[in-house]
Each structure stands twice: as C-alpha cells, then as structure tokens.
C-alpha cells in the first residue's frame, strides 16, 4: 500500500491510499512449454486450403508428441463483412460469439450424394492446398458453395435433432441476431446496419419473427444456425481432446468490437460509438495507431454488474481453459481518438486526470 498525491485542479491536492492486495490469489505450481499459432496456419492434407478445427485437433496430437503443455490460438470469431480479403483481419469480428465459417472441417459435415459435385470439390481441395499461402477469398467462396449443398442435403435432419435443439436453446440469445445480421448484410450489401433500409434499429420481436420456420427468410437464416452448430461441435471435440491429453487450449479475446457488428447493432448502449480506440505515438508508430473500434461505456456496464463481459467469459470457458485478453490495460484506461481523426495523434487517455494549461506553465513546460 502506498500514499498517492492526486490533483483535481490547480491548488487542489488530496491524498489517497492505493494498494493491490486484493488482486492476488494462490495458483498451483505449473510449468510447461507451448506454441502460439493462428488456426488458419494449421493447413494439412486434410484441410480445404486453410487450417480448420479438425487441424486444431491434429495440432494437439503434435503438442502431445513433443511433450508440450499448451496451444494458444488467435481470435477465431467471424469477421465476414465484404466477402473479400479485407475480412481476413482476425481482430475485427462481427460477433463476439460466432465462429468464422472458414474454420469448419468440411469432411465432418458429411459427403455430398452428388458424386460429380463431390469429385469437383475434391479436385478444388487439392488445388487450394497446393497454394503457397491461403487464398482467403477462394477458400471462403468454395466452402460456402459446399455449405449450401450440404445444408440442402442434411440441414433438415440436423436442425430437427435433439443435440441441435439443446445448442439452440442455450445460444439463441446471440445466435439469432448473428444469423439475421449476416443474412441482412448480404441482402443489403453492407455490414453497416445504419444504412439498411429496414431493420437498421434492432427490434428483438421483429428478428424473432424472421427466425421462425414459417418465415420466407428462414432458409437463408437457418444455414447460419447449421454452420455455427457444427463449428461448436468441432471446436468442442478439439477442446475435449486437449483436456483428455493434458494440454491447455488457450484462446484470445480482443478487447474491442467492430463498429459494424452484431453487438453494436443490438446493444449500442454499451459502447461509445462517437469515438475510436487506438494507441499513442511511440517509437514503432510515430503517428500513433487508430484501430477504428468504439470504446466501452463502463458506466452503463457497471449498472448490470458487467453482465456483457460475464456472458462473454462464460462462453469462452466452454472451449478454453485459459484465454488472453488483448489488451488488459484497456480495461483501466484506453487511448480514445475523435471520429474525424485518421491517426492516433489527437487522442487522449480515458479516464485520466488531465493537466490544465496553468498547471503545465507552473511546471515550467511552456506551450
């Protein structure tokens, strides 16, 4: 515990005791080596041009064989906004819950009964796997072609299963808005929901209607239910495989959300959408950094006991025994930049105790 002198303004100084005694807790001794790797880099002969959750399970086998104890991955949430390579940045997701469809192991979805179509996909798989790097657009385009065909073939059976029913009931709070958002994004050709001619303001009752089986839009929405259910099963299988073999699977939680995301659409009150987060200038970035992400409205979040974060952490804990928060310092203060700014130069830390002009001049720092 130490005494700190703080200032509210010129000549107004008060003392506060600051300590960190309550942030420590005992942990069992643990020592081990591990590897950090993006899932998209885990390409194998069984992949479809990009690493997937099936490859993640095989990565755990490799960790076991090399006596490693941890596998850490980058964010795996859906980042689809334009269906172009600009969506490939893993830290700008459209949902904090939904996984990126490209991480689906297509083999686990089943084989197409159309033998000619299946042969064509097998040929394209070899072509994509032979590339020196991931062709993001080609991979996602091809996988979505497969999704539509396999959903038409197997979707009704899967969506009527007890396992899907349990998944849906446990996840519908985020799953329905995500599925509708993704559908409307493609219908209106933009992820910026503010520009949508209809549903630009989130209405839970209207979204619920769209998700009903009798809705004309249902088939286009239900395919997202199907994909997310399979992603859940595949990642959970990798998780259980890791736990059974004594390997810690570690996830990644980006602190920010996209301005054009499901959360910004459904829960705008939790965010300061009139500012953007970034980083101040330093030796690595002389103009600072502008991430373009809204900051959090912590005062609003505090009122419900940070329920938004609690739900997010609980969901992550289903799949990961540890996760990185990038970056934890942002929970305490963040570099906030005006909306008109391009670089990070004009930002300021929030919250902060700023110095007045008079205080700066009294400190012999002249401006």
Question: How would you label these PLM feature ranges?
Answer:
Residues 1-14, 365-366:
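Single conserved hydrophobic/aromatic residue that forms the stacking wall/gate
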Residues 4, 253, 327-328:
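Generic detector of well-ordered alpha-helical packing
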Residues 12-23:
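Short beta-strand elements
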Residues 27-268, 301-307, 311-315, 334:
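Acidic/aromatic-lined carbohydrate-recognition and catalytic surfaces
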Residues 77-84, 258-261, 281-291, 329-340:
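Flexible glycine/acidic-rich beta-alpha junction loops that bind and position SAM and/or redox cofactors
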Residues 88-113, 263-286, 343-363:
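Acidic, His- and aromatic-enriched active-site or binding-groove loops in soluble protein domains
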Residues 289-364:
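Active-site capping/gating regions of soluble enzymes
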